[in-house]
Amino acid sequence: MARITIPYAVADFADMRERGFYYVDKTNYIPGLEDYKAPVFLRPRRFGKSLLISMLAHYYDRTKANRFEELFGGTWIGEHPTKEHNQYLVIRYDFSAMVMANDMEGLAQNFNKLNCIPVEVTLEHNRDLFGDFQFTTRGNAAQMLEELLGYASSRGLPKVYILIDEYDNFTNQLLTSYNDPLYEKVTTSDSFLRTFFKVIKKGIGEGTIRTCFCTGVLPVTMDDLTSGYNIAEILTLEPSFLNMLGFTYEETKTYLRYVLDKYTPGASEERFEESWQLIVSNYDGYRFSPVGERLFNSTILTYFLKKFAANAGSIPPELIDENLRTDINWIRRLTLSLTNAKEMLDALVIDDELSYNVSDLSSKFNKKKFFEKEFYPVSLFYLGMTTLKSAYRMVLPNMTMRSIYMDYYNQLNKIEGNASRYVPVYELYDSNRSFEPLVQNYFEQYLGQFPAQVFDKINENFIRCSFYELVSRYLSHCYTFAIEQNNSFGRSDFEMTGIPGTDYYTDDRVVEFKYYRSKDADRMLALTEPLAEHVEQVKGYAEDTKKKFPNYNVRSYVVYICANKGWKCWEV
Protein backbone atom coordinates (compact mmCIF):
# COMPACT_ATOMS: atom_id res chain seq x y z
CA MET A 1 0.00 0.00 0.00
CA ALA A 2 1.19 3.54 -0.78
CA ARG A 3 2.62 5.57 2.11
CA ILE A 4 0.01 7.73 3.83
CA THR A 5 0.63 11.35 2.84
CA ILE A 6 -2.43 12.94 4.43
CA PRO A 7 -1.06 15.46 6.95
CA TYR A 8 -3.35 15.16 9.98
CA ALA A 9 -1.74 16.98 12.97
CA VAL A 10 1.20 18.11 10.81
CA ALA A 11 1.75 21.81 11.45
CA ASP A 12 5.38 22.15 10.31
CA PHE A 13 5.46 23.47 6.74
CA ALA A 14 9.01 22.23 6.06
CA ASP A 15 8.19 18.77 7.39
CA MET A 16 5.09 18.65 5.20
CA ARG A 17 7.02 19.57 2.06
CA GLU A 18 10.04 17.37 2.79
CA ARG A 19 7.91 14.28 3.37
CA GLY A 20 5.68 14.83 0.36
CA PHE A 21 2.45 15.39 2.26
CA TYR A 22 -0.56 16.72 0.39
CA TYR A 23 -0.73 20.51 0.71
CA VAL A 24 -3.78 22.63 -0.03
CA ASP A 25 -2.03 25.71 -1.36
CA LYS A 26 -2.87 28.90 0.54
CA THR A 27 0.26 30.81 -0.47
CA ASN A 28 -1.72 33.09 -2.78
CA TYR A 29 -2.80 35.07 0.30
CA ILE A 30 0.76 36.22 1.04
CA PRO A 31 0.72 39.34 -1.18
CA GLY A 32 -2.49 40.56 0.46
CA LEU A 33 -1.06 40.09 3.95
CA GLU A 34 1.90 42.29 3.01
CA ASP A 35 -0.44 45.28 2.97
CA TYR A 36 -0.74 45.11 6.77
CA LYS A 37 1.58 45.80 9.70
CA ALA A 38 -0.41 44.23 12.56
CA PRO A 39 -2.86 41.74 11.04
CA VAL A 40 -4.90 39.44 13.27
CA PHE A 41 -6.75 36.46 11.83
CA LEU A 42 -9.29 34.55 13.91
CA ARG A 43 -10.75 31.13 13.25
CA PRO A 44 -12.20 28.37 15.44
CA ARG A 45 -9.97 25.71 16.91
CA ARG A 46 -8.44 23.13 14.58
CA PHE A 47 -8.79 25.21 11.41
CA GLY A 48 -5.15 25.01 10.31
CA LYS A 49 -3.85 28.22 11.90
CA SER A 50 -0.52 26.73 13.03
CA LEU A 51 0.34 25.48 9.53
CA LEU A 52 -0.35 28.97 8.14
CA ILE A 53 2.02 30.45 10.73
CA SER A 54 4.69 27.89 9.84
CA MET A 55 4.31 28.58 6.12
CA LEU A 56 4.76 32.33 6.66
CA ALA A 57 7.77 31.73 8.91
CA HIS A 58 9.53 29.71 6.21
CA TYR A 59 8.61 32.26 3.54
CA TYR A 60 10.00 35.33 5.31
CA ASP A 61 12.96 33.86 7.24
CA ARG A 62 16.25 35.06 5.72
CA THR A 63 17.99 31.90 6.93
CA LYS A 64 15.68 29.77 4.74
CA ALA A 65 16.53 31.57 1.48
CA ASN A 66 18.58 28.63 0.17
CA ARG A 67 15.52 26.37 0.54
CA PHE A 68 12.98 28.57 -1.23
CA GLU A 69 12.61 26.35 -4.29
CA GLU A 70 12.58 23.18 -2.20
CA LEU A 71 9.82 24.48 0.09
CA PHE A 72 7.75 26.61 -2.28
CA GLY A 73 8.35 25.06 -5.69
CA GLY A 74 5.03 24.12 -7.26
CA THR A 75 3.02 26.50 -5.06
CA TRP A 76 1.36 29.71 -6.20
CA ILE A 77 3.88 31.90 -4.39
CA GLY A 78 6.72 29.82 -5.81
CA GLU A 79 5.63 31.02 -9.25
CA HIS A 80 4.79 34.57 -8.07
CA PRO A 81 7.25 35.44 -5.26
CA THR A 82 7.07 38.86 -3.65
CA LYS A 83 10.17 40.99 -3.12
CA GLU A 84 9.95 40.37 0.62
CA HIS A 85 10.53 36.62 0.63
CA ASN A 86 13.38 35.52 2.91
CA GLN A 87 14.17 39.11 3.88
CA TYR A 88 13.52 39.22 7.63
CA LEU A 89 14.55 38.09 11.08
CA VAL A 90 11.62 35.87 11.99
CA ILE A 91 10.53 35.40 15.61
CA ARG A 92 7.82 32.82 16.07
CA TYR A 93 5.81 32.60 19.29
CA ASP A 94 3.27 29.92 20.21
CA PHE A 95 1.06 30.96 23.13
CA SER A 96 -0.80 27.63 23.09
CA ALA A 97 2.23 26.08 24.81
CA MET A 98 1.76 28.34 27.83
CA VAL A 99 1.60 26.49 31.16
CA MET A 100 -1.25 27.79 33.30
CA ALA A 101 -0.95 29.07 36.88
CA ASN A 102 -3.35 30.33 39.55
CA ASP A 103 -1.81 33.76 40.15
CA MET A 104 -0.16 36.61 38.26
CA GLU A 105 3.31 35.77 39.49
CA GLY A 106 3.04 32.21 38.23
CA LEU A 107 1.57 33.26 34.88
CA ALA A 108 4.25 35.90 34.35
CA GLN A 109 6.97 33.39 35.17
CA ASN A 110 5.52 30.81 32.75
CA PHE A 111 4.96 33.42 30.03
CA ASN A 112 8.56 34.59 30.24
CA LYS A 113 9.94 31.06 30.39
CA LEU A 114 8.06 30.20 27.19
CA ASN A 115 8.61 33.41 25.23
CA CYS A 116 12.25 34.16 25.93
CA ILE A 117 13.17 31.08 23.91
CA PRO A 118 11.95 32.29 20.45
CA VAL A 119 14.09 35.45 20.72
CA GLU A 120 17.15 33.40 21.66
CA VAL A 121 16.48 31.00 18.77
CA THR A 122 16.26 33.90 16.30
CA LEU A 123 19.52 35.32 17.64
CA GLU A 124 21.37 32.02 17.18
CA HIS A 125 19.91 31.42 13.72
CA ASN A 126 21.13 34.87 12.67
CA ARG A 127 24.44 34.87 14.53
CA ASP A 128 26.16 35.89 11.27
CA LEU A 129 24.52 39.30 11.70
CA PHE A 130 24.65 39.62 15.48
CA GLY A 131 28.29 38.64 15.99
CA ASP A 132 29.10 38.37 19.70
CA PHE A 133 25.91 40.13 20.87
CA GLN A 134 24.58 38.81 24.17
CA PHE A 135 21.45 39.77 26.09
CA THR A 136 22.10 41.90 29.16
CA THR A 137 18.71 40.90 30.59
CA ARG A 138 17.39 37.36 30.66
CA GLY A 139 14.15 35.86 31.88
CA ASN A 140 11.89 38.69 30.67
CA ALA A 141 10.34 38.14 27.23
CA ALA A 142 9.39 41.79 26.63
CA GLN A 143 12.81 43.14 27.65
CA MET A 144 14.70 40.57 25.58
CA LEU A 145 12.59 41.36 22.51
CA GLU A 146 13.15 45.08 23.07
CA GLU A 147 16.90 44.55 23.43
CA LEU A 148 17.12 42.52 20.22
CA LEU A 149 15.07 45.11 18.33
CA GLY A 150 17.29 47.90 19.61
CA TYR A 151 20.48 46.15 18.53
CA ALA A 152 19.07 45.28 15.08
CA SER A 153 17.95 48.87 14.55
CA SER A 154 21.26 50.40 15.65
CA ARG A 155 23.24 48.14 13.31
CA GLY A 156 20.93 48.54 10.30
CA LEU A 157 20.03 44.84 10.33
CA PRO A 158 16.97 43.45 8.51
CA LYS A 159 13.59 44.13 10.05
CA VAL A 160 11.89 41.64 12.33
CA TYR A 161 8.82 39.66 11.28
CA ILE A 162 6.87 38.42 14.32
CA LEU A 163 4.39 35.55 14.23
CA ILE A 164 2.19 34.75 17.25
CA ASP A 165 0.17 31.55 17.06
CA GLU A 166 -2.95 31.28 19.27
CA TYR A 167 -2.41 34.69 20.85
CA ASP A 168 -5.47 34.21 23.12
CA ASN A 169 -5.02 30.55 24.06
CA PHE A 170 -4.06 30.97 27.69
CA THR A 171 -6.38 33.93 28.33
CA ASN A 172 -9.26 31.86 26.95
CA GLN A 173 -8.29 29.10 29.37
CA LEU A 174 -8.65 31.60 32.21
CA LEU A 175 -12.18 32.35 30.99
CA THR A 176 -13.25 28.71 30.63
CA SER A 177 -11.92 27.98 34.12
CA TYR A 178 -14.00 30.87 35.55
CA ASN A 179 -10.88 32.78 36.60
CA ASP A 180 -12.17 36.18 35.50
CA PRO A 181 -10.28 38.20 38.16
CA LEU A 182 -6.95 36.84 36.91
CA TYR A 183 -8.00 37.46 33.30
CA GLU A 184 -8.70 41.11 34.19
CA LYS A 185 -5.24 41.46 35.74
CA VAL A 186 -3.55 39.92 32.69
CA THR A 187 -5.28 42.25 30.20
CA THR A 188 -5.12 45.52 32.16
CA SER A 189 -2.62 47.88 33.77
CA ASP A 190 1.06 47.07 33.21
CA SER A 191 0.73 43.30 33.09
CA PHE A 192 3.36 41.13 31.43
CA LEU A 193 1.04 40.61 28.42
CA ARG A 194 0.27 44.30 27.87
CA THR A 195 3.95 45.16 28.29
CA PHE A 196 4.88 42.53 25.70
CA PHE A 197 2.43 43.92 23.15
CA LYS A 198 3.51 47.48 23.89
CA VAL A 199 7.05 46.53 22.85
CA ILE A 200 5.67 45.13 19.58
CA LYS A 201 3.53 48.23 19.01
CA LYS A 202 6.57 50.45 19.57
CA GLY A 203 8.69 48.33 17.22
CA ILE A 204 6.09 48.57 14.44
CA GLY A 205 5.85 52.32 14.96
CA GLU A 206 9.61 52.77 14.77
CA GLY A 207 9.94 50.48 11.76
CA THR A 208 12.12 47.81 13.37
CA ILE A 209 9.25 45.31 13.13
CA ARG A 210 7.96 44.76 9.60
CA THR A 211 4.85 42.87 10.68
CA CYS A 212 3.34 41.16 13.69
CA PHE A 213 0.84 38.55 12.48
CA CYS A 214 -1.36 36.98 15.16
CA THR A 215 -3.78 34.09 14.95
CA GLY A 216 -6.38 33.21 17.56
CA VAL A 217 -9.98 32.23 18.18
CA LEU A 218 -11.65 35.26 19.77
CA PRO A 219 -11.21 39.03 19.46
CA VAL A 220 -11.94 39.42 23.18
CA THR A 221 -8.37 39.50 24.51
CA MET A 222 -7.23 41.82 21.71
CA ASP A 223 -10.04 44.23 22.57
CA ASP A 224 -9.40 44.06 26.31
CA LEU A 225 -5.72 44.92 25.79
CA THR A 226 -7.06 48.32 24.58
CA SER A 227 -4.28 50.90 24.30
CA GLY A 228 -1.62 48.24 24.81
CA TYR A 229 -2.11 47.12 21.19
CA ASN A 230 -4.64 49.39 19.52
CA ILE A 231 -2.96 49.07 16.13
CA ALA A 232 -4.31 45.55 15.46
CA GLU A 233 -6.03 45.09 12.09
CA ILE A 234 -8.45 42.17 12.34
CA LEU A 235 -8.87 40.51 8.95
CA THR A 236 -11.26 37.75 10.01
CA LEU A 237 -14.30 39.09 8.17
CA GLU A 238 -12.50 40.75 5.26
CA PRO A 239 -13.88 39.30 1.98
CA SER A 240 -10.44 38.81 0.43
CA PHE A 241 -9.29 36.61 3.34
CA LEU A 242 -12.41 34.55 4.07
CA ASN A 243 -10.99 31.39 2.45
CA MET A 244 -7.43 31.72 3.78
CA LEU A 245 -8.14 28.91 6.27
CA GLY A 246 -10.52 26.02 5.72
CA PHE A 247 -11.11 24.22 2.42
CA THR A 248 -13.48 25.34 -0.31
CA TYR A 249 -15.65 22.87 -2.24
CA GLU A 250 -13.20 22.96 -5.15
CA GLU A 251 -10.18 22.36 -2.89
CA THR A 252 -11.95 19.52 -1.10
CA LYS A 253 -13.06 17.74 -4.26
CA THR A 254 -9.49 17.89 -5.58
CA TYR A 255 -8.22 16.53 -2.25
CA LEU A 256 -10.74 13.66 -2.31
CA ARG A 257 -9.79 12.70 -5.87
CA TYR A 258 -6.13 12.65 -4.83
CA VAL A 259 -6.94 10.27 -1.95
CA LEU A 260 -9.10 7.97 -4.09
CA ASP A 261 -6.60 7.88 -6.96
CA LYS A 262 -3.69 7.09 -4.65
CA TYR A 263 -5.26 4.66 -2.20
CA THR A 264 -8.10 3.07 -4.20
CA PRO A 265 -6.80 2.93 -7.79
CA GLY A 266 -9.55 2.50 -10.33
CA ALA A 267 -12.25 3.90 -8.04
CA SER A 268 -15.40 4.63 -10.03
CA GLU A 269 -17.10 7.99 -10.36
CA GLU A 270 -19.93 6.53 -8.30
CA ARG A 271 -17.44 5.84 -5.51
CA PHE A 272 -16.33 9.45 -5.66
CA GLU A 273 -19.94 10.66 -5.42
CA GLU A 274 -20.64 8.35 -2.46
CA SER A 275 -17.60 9.66 -0.61
CA TRP A 276 -18.36 13.25 -1.52
CA GLN A 277 -21.93 12.97 -0.23
CA LEU A 278 -20.62 11.57 3.06
CA ILE A 279 -18.10 14.42 3.41
CA VAL A 280 -20.69 17.11 2.68
CA SER A 281 -23.17 15.59 5.14
CA ASN A 282 -20.70 15.31 8.00
CA TYR A 283 -18.17 18.11 7.62
CA ASP A 284 -19.56 20.89 5.45
CA GLY A 285 -21.20 24.07 6.55
CA TYR A 286 -18.85 26.78 7.84
CA ARG A 287 -19.58 30.20 6.41
CA PHE A 288 -17.84 33.27 7.80
CA SER A 289 -19.79 35.85 5.84
CA PRO A 290 -23.47 35.86 4.83
CA VAL A 291 -22.32 35.90 1.20
CA GLY A 292 -19.17 33.80 1.65
CA GLU A 293 -18.47 30.31 0.32
CA ARG A 294 -19.17 27.30 2.50
CA LEU A 295 -15.94 25.91 3.94
CA PHE A 296 -14.77 22.66 5.45
CA ASN A 297 -12.84 22.67 8.71
CA SER A 298 -9.47 21.59 7.34
CA THR A 299 -8.27 19.63 10.38
CA ILE A 300 -11.52 17.70 10.81
CA LEU A 301 -11.60 16.85 7.11
CA THR A 302 -7.96 15.78 7.11
CA TYR A 303 -8.69 13.57 10.14
CA PHE A 304 -11.31 11.76 8.06
CA LEU A 305 -9.23 11.56 4.88
CA LYS A 306 -6.22 10.12 6.69
CA LYS A 307 -8.35 7.34 8.20
CA PHE A 308 -10.06 6.90 4.82
CA ALA A 309 -6.66 6.46 3.14
CA ALA A 310 -5.36 4.13 5.85
CA ASN A 311 -8.46 1.95 5.33
CA ALA A 312 -7.76 1.81 1.58
CA GLY A 313 -10.84 3.86 0.82
CA SER A 314 -13.17 2.23 3.36
CA ILE A 315 -15.23 4.57 5.51
CA PRO A 316 -13.70 4.76 9.01
CA PRO A 317 -16.02 3.78 11.87
CA GLU A 318 -15.36 7.01 13.80
CA LEU A 319 -16.27 10.13 11.83
CA ILE A 320 -16.03 12.68 14.65
CA ASP A 321 -12.67 14.01 15.78
CA GLU A 322 -13.07 13.57 19.54
CA ASN A 323 -10.86 16.60 20.18
CA LEU A 324 -13.85 18.74 19.19
CA ARG A 325 -15.91 17.57 22.14
CA THR A 326 -13.81 19.74 24.44
CA ASP A 327 -15.55 22.74 22.88
CA ILE A 328 -18.55 21.92 25.07
CA ASN A 329 -16.62 23.57 27.92
CA TRP A 330 -17.24 26.86 26.16
CA ILE A 331 -21.01 26.34 26.16
CA ARG A 332 -20.95 25.65 29.89
CA ARG A 333 -18.88 28.77 30.53
CA LEU A 334 -20.69 30.99 28.08
CA THR A 335 -24.20 30.36 29.33
CA LEU A 336 -23.26 30.66 33.04
CA SER A 337 -26.48 29.00 34.22
CA LEU A 338 -28.32 25.77 33.50
CA THR A 339 -31.41 27.74 32.45
CA ASN A 340 -29.47 29.77 29.89
CA ALA A 341 -27.75 26.64 28.56
CA LYS A 342 -31.07 24.84 28.10
CA GLU A 343 -32.64 27.84 26.35
CA MET A 344 -29.77 28.09 23.91
CA LEU A 345 -29.70 24.36 23.22
CA ASP A 346 -33.47 24.36 22.72
CA ALA A 347 -33.04 27.03 20.06
CA LEU A 348 -30.40 24.99 18.26
CA VAL A 349 -31.68 21.41 18.49
CA ILE A 350 -35.40 22.24 18.34
CA ASP A 351 -35.62 25.39 16.21
CA ASP A 352 -32.38 24.60 14.34
CA GLU A 353 -31.26 28.23 14.29
CA LEU A 354 -30.40 31.36 16.24
CA SER A 355 -31.20 34.89 15.12
CA TYR A 356 -28.43 37.49 15.29
CA ASN A 357 -27.63 41.09 14.39
CA VAL A 358 -25.19 41.19 11.50
CA SER A 359 -23.68 44.39 12.95
CA ASP A 360 -22.57 42.33 15.98
CA LEU A 361 -20.11 40.44 13.77
CA SER A 362 -17.67 43.21 14.52
CA SER A 363 -13.96 42.65 14.54
CA LYS A 364 -13.66 43.50 18.22
CA PHE A 365 -15.75 43.04 21.35
CA ASN A 366 -14.77 42.77 24.98
CA LYS A 367 -15.28 40.07 27.60
CA LYS A 368 -18.33 41.75 29.08
CA LYS A 369 -20.18 41.69 25.78
CA PHE A 370 -19.00 38.15 24.99
CA PHE A 371 -20.97 36.79 27.96
CA GLU A 372 -24.16 38.78 27.38
CA LYS A 373 -27.13 36.54 26.62
CA GLU A 374 -28.12 38.50 23.50
CA PHE A 375 -24.60 38.03 22.16
CA TYR A 376 -24.50 34.20 22.47
CA PRO A 377 -24.95 33.59 18.72
CA VAL A 378 -21.93 35.72 17.81
CA SER A 379 -19.83 34.22 20.60
CA LEU A 380 -20.67 30.72 19.34
CA PHE A 381 -19.91 31.83 15.78
CA TYR A 382 -16.33 32.78 16.67
CA LEU A 383 -15.94 29.50 18.55
CA GLY A 384 -17.00 27.58 15.41
CA MET A 385 -20.08 26.13 17.10
CA THR A 386 -22.55 27.94 14.87
CA THR A 387 -22.19 29.36 11.40
CA LEU A 388 -24.00 31.82 9.17
CA LYS A 389 -27.09 30.69 7.29
CA SER A 390 -28.01 34.20 6.15
CA ALA A 391 -27.63 37.83 7.20
CA TYR A 392 -30.19 37.14 9.94
CA ARG A 393 -29.81 33.57 11.17
CA MET A 394 -27.15 31.13 12.33
CA VAL A 395 -27.31 27.34 12.28
CA LEU A 396 -25.24 24.34 13.33
CA PRO A 397 -22.53 23.90 10.69
CA ASN A 398 -22.69 20.14 10.11
CA MET A 399 -23.60 16.67 11.36
CA THR A 400 -20.48 16.53 13.49
CA MET A 401 -21.56 19.56 15.48
CA ARG A 402 -25.18 18.35 15.61
CA SER A 403 -23.98 15.17 17.28
CA ILE A 404 -21.93 17.11 19.83
CA TYR A 405 -24.82 19.46 20.68
CA MET A 406 -27.32 16.62 20.88
CA ASP A 407 -25.05 14.71 23.24
CA TYR A 408 -24.77 17.76 25.49
CA TYR A 409 -28.54 18.31 25.32
CA ASN A 410 -29.05 14.77 26.59
CA GLN A 411 -26.58 15.38 29.43
CA LEU A 412 -28.32 18.58 30.55
CA ASN A 413 -31.73 16.93 30.46
CA LYS A 414 -30.45 13.83 32.28
CA ILE A 415 -31.42 11.48 29.46
CA GLU A 416 -29.89 8.10 30.15
CA GLY A 417 -27.75 6.64 27.42
CA ASN A 418 -26.92 3.30 28.98
CA ALA A 419 -26.52 0.61 26.35
CA SER A 420 -28.97 -1.81 27.96
CA ARG A 421 -31.84 0.38 26.72
CA TYR A 422 -30.81 0.10 23.09
CA VAL A 423 -28.35 -2.71 22.36
CA PRO A 424 -30.86 -5.61 22.15
CA VAL A 425 -32.80 -3.88 19.36
CA TYR A 426 -29.67 -3.03 17.38
CA GLU A 427 -28.32 -6.56 17.77
CA LEU A 428 -31.57 -7.81 16.28
CA TYR A 429 -31.29 -5.30 13.44
CA ASP A 430 -28.00 -6.95 12.43
CA SER A 431 -29.92 -10.08 11.54
CA ASN A 432 -33.35 -8.90 10.34
CA ARG A 433 -32.58 -5.36 9.01
CA SER A 434 -36.05 -4.28 10.14
CA PHE A 435 -36.32 -0.50 10.49
CA GLU A 436 -39.61 -0.34 12.42
CA PRO A 437 -38.16 -1.66 15.73
CA LEU A 438 -35.60 1.15 15.66
CA VAL A 439 -38.44 3.68 15.66
CA GLN A 440 -40.22 1.83 18.45
CA ASN A 441 -37.06 1.69 20.54
CA TYR A 442 -36.42 5.41 19.96
CA PHE A 443 -39.95 6.31 21.03
CA GLU A 444 -40.09 4.10 24.11
CA GLN A 445 -36.54 4.22 25.44
CA TYR A 446 -35.40 7.70 24.37
CA LEU A 447 -38.46 9.92 24.07
CA GLY A 448 -40.04 8.00 26.94
CA GLN A 449 -37.59 9.63 29.34
CA PHE A 450 -38.88 13.16 28.71
CA PRO A 451 -41.56 14.81 30.86
CA ALA A 452 -44.95 15.45 29.23
CA GLN A 453 -44.47 19.22 28.87
CA VAL A 454 -41.50 18.74 26.55
CA PHE A 455 -43.77 17.31 23.86
CA ASP A 456 -45.51 20.66 23.45
CA LYS A 457 -42.18 22.24 22.61
CA ILE A 458 -40.30 19.81 20.37
CA ASN A 459 -40.76 19.54 16.60
CA GLU A 460 -39.66 17.59 13.54
CA ASN A 461 -36.17 19.04 13.63
CA PHE A 462 -35.68 17.74 17.15
CA ILE A 463 -37.04 14.33 16.15
CA ARG A 464 -34.69 13.86 13.20
CA CYS A 465 -31.66 15.21 15.11
CA SER A 466 -32.23 13.07 18.20
CA PHE A 467 -33.08 9.99 16.11
CA TYR A 468 -29.87 10.50 14.15
CA GLU A 469 -27.80 10.87 17.34
CA LEU A 470 -29.21 7.64 18.75
CA VAL A 471 -29.02 5.51 15.60
CA SER A 472 -25.52 6.72 14.76
CA ARG A 473 -24.29 5.56 18.17
CA TYR A 474 -24.96 1.94 17.23
CA LEU A 475 -24.88 1.81 13.44
CA SER A 476 -22.05 4.16 12.45
CA HIS A 477 -19.81 1.15 11.79
CA CYS A 478 -22.04 0.11 8.91
CA TYR A 479 -24.02 3.19 7.81
CA THR A 480 -23.41 6.83 7.06
CA PHE A 481 -26.14 9.35 7.80
CA ALA A 482 -27.55 12.55 6.37
CA ILE A 483 -30.12 15.02 7.66
CA GLU A 484 -31.93 17.33 5.23
CA GLN A 485 -30.01 15.95 2.29
CA ASN A 486 -30.29 18.26 -0.72
CA ASN A 487 -31.66 16.68 -3.89
CA SER A 488 -33.74 17.73 -6.87
CA PHE A 489 -37.01 16.87 -5.10
CA GLY A 490 -36.24 18.88 -1.97
CA ARG A 491 -34.51 18.10 1.33
CA SER A 492 -34.97 14.63 2.78
CA ASP A 493 -35.44 14.44 6.56
CA PHE A 494 -33.15 11.50 7.22
CA GLU A 495 -31.16 9.03 5.17
CA MET A 496 -28.90 6.16 6.18
CA THR A 497 -26.65 4.53 3.60
CA GLY A 498 -24.67 1.28 3.92
CA ILE A 499 -20.91 1.76 3.94
CA PRO A 500 -18.91 0.31 1.01
CA GLY A 501 -16.95 -2.76 2.06
CA THR A 502 -19.52 -3.84 4.66
CA ASP A 503 -22.45 -6.26 4.40
CA TYR A 504 -24.72 -3.22 4.50
CA TYR A 505 -23.39 -1.66 1.31
CA THR A 506 -26.15 -0.65 -1.16
CA ASP A 507 -28.76 -0.72 1.65
CA ASP A 508 -30.29 2.75 1.75
CA ARG A 509 -33.17 3.97 3.93
CA VAL A 510 -34.91 7.30 3.32
CA VAL A 511 -37.22 8.55 6.08
CA GLU A 512 -39.79 11.33 6.24
CA PHE A 513 -40.56 12.29 9.85
CA LYS A 514 -43.74 14.09 10.89
CA TYR A 515 -44.36 15.30 14.42
CA TYR A 516 -47.80 15.95 15.89
CA ARG A 517 -48.62 17.53 19.23
CA SER A 518 -51.12 16.09 21.71
CA LYS A 519 -54.19 17.75 20.19
CA ASP A 520 -53.64 15.92 16.88
CA ALA A 521 -52.14 12.71 18.24
CA ASP A 522 -55.27 10.53 18.48
CA ARG A 523 -56.40 11.47 14.97
CA MET A 524 -53.03 10.60 13.43
CA LEU A 525 -52.62 7.39 15.42
CA ALA A 526 -55.99 6.20 14.08
CA LEU A 527 -54.70 6.25 10.50
CA THR A 528 -54.07 2.91 8.83
CA GLU A 529 -51.85 4.41 6.13
CA PRO A 530 -49.81 7.61 5.80
CA LEU A 531 -51.15 10.73 4.09
CA ALA A 532 -50.67 10.70 0.33
CA GLU A 533 -48.59 13.88 0.24
CA HIS A 534 -46.10 12.39 2.70
CA VAL A 535 -45.78 9.25 0.61
CA GLU A 536 -45.21 11.30 -2.52
CA GLN A 537 -42.62 13.37 -0.70
CA VAL A 538 -40.47 10.51 0.56
CA LYS A 539 -40.78 8.54 -2.68
CA GLY A 540 -39.45 11.57 -4.54
CA TYR A 541 -36.39 11.63 -2.30
CA ALA A 542 -35.91 7.88 -2.75
CA GLU A 543 -36.11 8.19 -6.54
CA ASP A 544 -33.44 10.89 -6.45
CA THR A 545 -31.10 8.62 -4.53
CA LYS A 546 -31.81 5.76 -6.93
CA LYS A 547 -30.97 7.95 -9.92
CA LYS A 548 -27.64 8.95 -8.37
CA PHE A 549 -26.78 5.42 -7.23
CA PRO A 550 -28.61 2.85 -9.41
CA ASN A 551 -27.08 -0.11 -7.57
CA TYR A 552 -28.62 0.93 -4.24
CA ASN A 553 -31.56 -0.92 -2.73
CA VAL A 554 -33.51 2.15 -1.64
CA ARG A 555 -36.34 1.72 0.86
CA SER A 556 -38.52 4.60 2.00
CA TYR A 557 -40.51 5.19 5.18
CA VAL A 558 -43.00 7.64 6.64
CA VAL A 559 -42.80 7.97 10.43
CA TYR A 560 -45.31 9.80 12.61
CA ILE A 561 -44.34 10.69 16.18
CA CYS A 562 -47.50 11.73 18.00
CA ALA A 563 -46.37 13.60 21.12
CA ASN A 564 -45.85 11.08 23.94
CA LYS A 565 -48.94 9.10 22.94
CA GLY A 566 -47.62 6.85 20.21
CA TRP A 567 -45.92 6.40 16.87
CA LYS A 568 -46.53 5.02 13.39
CA CYS A 569 -44.05 3.70 10.84
CA TRP A 570 -44.91 2.64 7.29
CA GLU A 571 -42.64 1.39 4.56
CA VAL A 572 -43.98 2.92 1.35
Per-region residue spans from a language model:
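Walker A/P-loop-proximal flanking segment of P-loop NTPase domains
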Residues: M1-R46, L51-Y60, E69-I77
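P-loop NTPase motor core
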Residues: A14, D61-E124
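Conserved P-loop NTPase "ATPase switch" module shared by AAA+ and STAND
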Residues: G156-V186
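Structural recognition of the conserved hydrophobic beta-strand(s) that form the central parallel beta-sheet
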Residues: L163-D165, R194-T195, I209-V217
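Amphipathic alpha-helical segments of the small helical/lid subdomains adjacent to P-loop NTPase cores
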Residues: T221-S227, L235-K306
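Extended alpha-helical interface modules used as scaffolds for assembling large macromolecular complexes
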Residues: A232, R294-H534, A542, V572
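Nucleic-acid nuclease catalytic cores
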Residues: A526-E571
